[in-house]
Amino acid sequence: MAQSINRRNILKQGTASLIAARFSSSIVSLARPAAKGASREWQCYGNDPGASRYSPLKQINRSNVSKLKVAWVHRTGDASQRPATTIECTPIMADGVVYLSTCQLQVHALDAATGKLLWSFDPTTVRRRRGAAGVNRAVCYWRQGNERRIFMPVKDMMFCLDATTGKLALGFGDGGVLDLKENFDCDMTGLSFNLTSPPVAYKDMILVGGGGGEGPEPAAPGHIRAFDARTGKRRWIFHTIPHPGEFGSDTWEGDSWKHAGGTNNWAGMSLDAEKGWLFASTGSPSFDFYGGNRKGANLFGNSVIALNADTGERLWHFQTTHHDVLDYDLPAQPALVKARHNGRQIDAVAQVTKTGL
């Protein structure tokens, strides 16, 4: 583009500027036929379940990128100063539709070719919902056969929407809404819980992370769960703070596991659907700057965890920081990559940390 765009100023004005070329080459004047087999869509938070964040499309390249023009702009219109709002979502595109979350955690569905608003969903219109300003990084798109659903986390709730109409899928949870503070295997009274990154779609399940904060306030642990994508029934749970008798429980001295929180998956998860493996990165145990009341290595805080996506069984883990008191939580979802090791190519997991890769 000839002119620079100040993203912060745009977002303050309540505008989500979607440069259409990023999502579909068919909506810019430079378009030409894509390479055979090339994916035209961005259906997951990280483009694909393995979080490559890479598109193989070749229509836009070094020779023509300077000629791009804005195809359309969508204004969300719900930014505010009180409460202060921000927008952190990565819009996804599936079946020619762009889905995004807004400053007030609404969901907007747009025609990818024109930017026309197809439908919107406001969580505050659902019973017992209060104002929903907050952070969300993306929605989750799930499809099996002719069924297509959008899963939208809003703080401690998850909404299940028909991807075509934006209406609540009433058979899921309680009228299309799932309370994420339930079925958590601990007393959640007075504990904070928040899901800011999208869940992961796998077979007929939705895999969910999240958790409580890492500060001094009482917070929930970051247990990882699987829910039936149609009914909302819990399928399995993995305790990121192990319960007595579980692997890693000996890394928490005494009863510290009972009162500690954090060890959350706030940055998102990745999936190898072919192998059926789920990869999660976790944050610090709470309180993240004091560990005197939680002596030990504190598994599975500050860890990359590989789970059987069908059962929740731990396959392996790697803890990047033992007994964290420096807030060295893992700030990104794991990325599944191909790497060369000892002369051969292997499947590997790359994890960004606050101290390097």
Q: Predicted regions span which residues?
A:
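N-terminal secretory signal peptides and thylakoid transit peptides that target proteins
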Residues: 2-18
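C-terminal segment of N-terminal export signals and the immediately downstream linker at the start
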Residues: 3, 24-47
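Mature N-terminal segment immediately following signal peptide/propeptide cleavage
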Residues: 36-77
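Repeat-blade elements of multi-bladed beta-propeller folds
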Residues: 42-46, 84-106, 131-158, 191-216, ...
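Active-site/binding-pocket entry motifs
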Residues: 48, 77, 244, 284-286
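Short, polar loop/linker segments at the starts of domains and inter-domain junctions
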Residues: 52-64, 83-87, 251-255
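Extracytoplasmic/lumenal domain signature
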Residues: 63-77, 107-129, 158-190, 223-259, ...
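Active-site-flanking structural segment that lines cofactor/substrate pockets
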Residues: 67-95
